Amino acid sequence: MNSLSTSAFSPVAFSLGLLLVMATAFPTPGPLGGDSKDDATSNRPPLTSADKMEDFIRFILGKISALKKEMCEKYNKCEDSKEALAENNLNLPKLAEEDKCFQSQFNQETCLTRITTGLQEFQIHLKYLEANYEGNKNNAHSVYISTKHLLQKLRPMNRVEVTTPDPTTDSSLQALFKSQDKWLKHVTIHLILRSLEDFLQFSLRAIRIM
């Protein structure tokens, strides 16, 4: 027991991975008379500081909302824009039924892996956003940095190694980005913001039940 206590309070214990181990090794006693569902839930590795994670995602969503509003006012890129064709070429991550993030077929491990890989895939799009956004640069930078930080928090919580995006896909996107005119840049930025917003909103709902 002493060796476990010593390792738990080493500097490395501040990582999310060891926090999860500590949470499993030292479960909080539940109320008397709890049902089997509560017992099963308590045995799953919980998200570390779930409330803080939710607040962090809401912070990013607030920045996205501000950028979308600015895009709508300055460049008329609003929710009713017809941009489906451009979206098909961007390979923007989405959460689908098979990702097991929806309540009807929820699976924590599968969902957490997909959220993490999705945020990883968004990185090239958010670098583009930061480099090309012509409005509030601080908000654009905040969305990029905050999403990257969220990814860093989630990565060690996965039981399996999270794969990196295919370099061929990244190269194709880079070529597409370089060929865009100003109008198409605005369309692309709007689509990135909208897709990231949807992805984070679904992720937020999933994290609430983890």
Swiss-Prot record:
One matching Pfam family: IL6
Sites of Phosphoserine modification: 81
Disulphide bonds in the chain: 72-78, 101-111
Domain of life: Eukaryota
Location of this chain's protein in the cell: Secreted
Entries under Gene3D superfamilies matching the protein: 1.20.1250.10
GO molecular function, one term: growth factor activity
Any one GO cellular component localisation term in the record: extracellular space
InterPro entries attached to this UniProt entry: 4_helix_cytokine-like_core, IL-6-like, IL-6/GCSF/MGF, IL6/GCSF/MGF_CS
Signal peptide: 1-25
GO biological process, one term: defense response to virus
Keywords on record: Acute phase, Cytokine, Disulfide bond, Growth factor, Phosphoprotein, Secreted, Signal
Physiological role: Cytokine with a wide variety of biological functions in immunity, tissue regeneration, and metabolism. Binds to IL6R, then the complex associates to the signaling subunit IL6ST/gp130 to trigger the intracellular IL6-signaling pathway. The interaction with the membrane-bound IL6R and IL6ST stimulates 'classic signaling', whereas the binding of IL6 and soluble IL6R to IL6ST stimulates 'trans-signaling'. Alternatively, 'cluster signaling' occurs when membrane-bound IL6:IL6R complexes on transmitter cells activate IL6ST receptors on neighboring receiver cells. IL6 is a potent inducer of the acute phase response. Rapid production of IL6 contributes to host defense during infection and tissue injury, but excessive IL6 synthesis is involved in disease pathology. In the innate immune response, is synthesized by myeloid cells, such as macrophages and dendritic cells, upon recognition of pathogens through toll-like receptors (TLRs) at the site of infection or tissue injury. In the adaptive immune response, is required for the differentiation of B cells into immunoglobulin-secreting cells.
Family from the record: Belongs to the IL-6 superfamily.
Protein name from the UniProt record: Interleukin-6
